[in-house]
Amino acid sequence: MSNHPKITSAHQNVEEKLRELQERFCHLQAARKEGRHGDLALLEAQISQNIREWQAELTAPSPESSLLGEGISQFLEEFAPLLKLDEEDDATSTLKEHAGAKPDPEGFSQSLCPPEWTSENFSQSPFNGNFSCGFEDALNSTETHGQQLHYGYEGFDPSINSAPDFHDQKLSSNLDITSQYDYIFSEVRQELDNSPSTKLDSSEEIDNFAEFSTPSSVRVPPSAFLGPKCALWDCTRPAQGSEWYLDYCSNYHGTLALNEDSPGTAPVLRPGGISLKDNLLIDALRAKTQGKNVGIPVCEGAVNTKCPWNAAELFHLELVEGETIREWLFFDKPRRAYDSGNRKQRSLPDYSGRGWHESRKQLMKEQEGQKRSYYMDPQPPGPFEWHLFEYQINESDACALYRLELKVGNGKKSPKGKISKDPLADLQKKMGQFKVASDKPSPPTKGRKE
């Protein structure tokens, strides 16, 4: 076995990067199954960044690459484009430039490595959910290779059982980024099958296979859901983090909560409405009062200093096609006009109407909180209707959670007061009752006898 310190360091670096990449893929798989589209976008960006950093390290000169000579440099130059995720279209990217007009599969695989390496096969298992990366000794080729490192990725899409044909398959230009990940990694596996392995040996024997299973944040026992939940406001998974993200289900959600409620952030926007029950919003408010980051920003005076339709920097009002409701979430200090249980109103300086008018107060005994509902009185001209919901908890009045709702109405806005459909009919009815009462014979009176 080689005791070269730089090779040992390189081996550990590769192991850590593979471990991190595998964990992010597990989170990506879980987010895809649970339909968390916001999480998918951020995870895809993180995976893309990790791969670009890895690509930069591969192409950077190092003592190990200089020892291996020009062969490995040529291999890395051919391998680096496979890690590029920012190509506009795979069908027109530089991946096809190596094949020529009529690509020959055998010739293409031979061009990736020197002739003296072509007889050596890269140890690779079928891509059925587990992939392995073999590292052999490049400096001491006569010594025996240690135990292979197997990195099993159980969370990967099992439908990918074989690599697509690199030369014949054509990708459409509207592939989503997750499909491009699957395709690119399948191509990498196919090219590594036809190329030599980079021989880097560890200085110590590995007792057990370094097999990765789905992280505990993806698979949890049912009893864990009865304990504390993830502090991210729209996540219902249990909090099973470690180190700095103890209050979250994963380090990804911890980072997401920290980024999305940072100062200066616009309110949380949800086209189509917020499909969460009120108890989860109360939980988010309670976690905020406990000093946790929940992914909802603080926006002081967002709906009290001016009308929401005049605050374009906070509330984006361009609805998408077919959208009938849009909601925003943010924290703010409770206003004095909302403290009383009586129905009150709060005027707005840029609106001639009465402003926000309280319509309902709901006590949430199980959650030890309350919810107040407001409507804009009167509603502004046009098809839009504005509603505001305020959530508070009994143990703290430091802040309140506000949910602002924009709803597309049917154009028929009726006043909130109860008005009779036909006032004339009511008047005639009352007059009829009075007439009947007046027609009744009066009791006889006794006259004085003369």
Curated annotation (Swiss-Prot):
Tissues expressed in: Ubiquitous. Expressed in the vascular bundles and mesophyll cells of various tissues. Expressed in the root, especially in the root tip. Also detected in stamen filaments, stipules and anthers.
UniProt keyword list: Activator, Cytoplasm, DNA-binding, Metal-binding, Nucleus, Phosphoprotein, Phytochrome signaling pathway, Transcription, Transcription regulation, Zinc, Zinc-finger
Region ranges (Disordered): 91-115, 339-374, 411-450
Binding site for Zn(2+): C230, C235, C249, H253
ZnF (C3H1-type) residues: 230-253
UniProt remark on domains: The VOZ region includes a DNA-binding domain and a dimerization domain. Contains an atypical zinc-finger followed by a basic region structurally related to the NAC domain.
Name assigned to this protein: Transcription factor VOZ2
Organism: Arabidopsis thaliana (Mouse-ear cress)
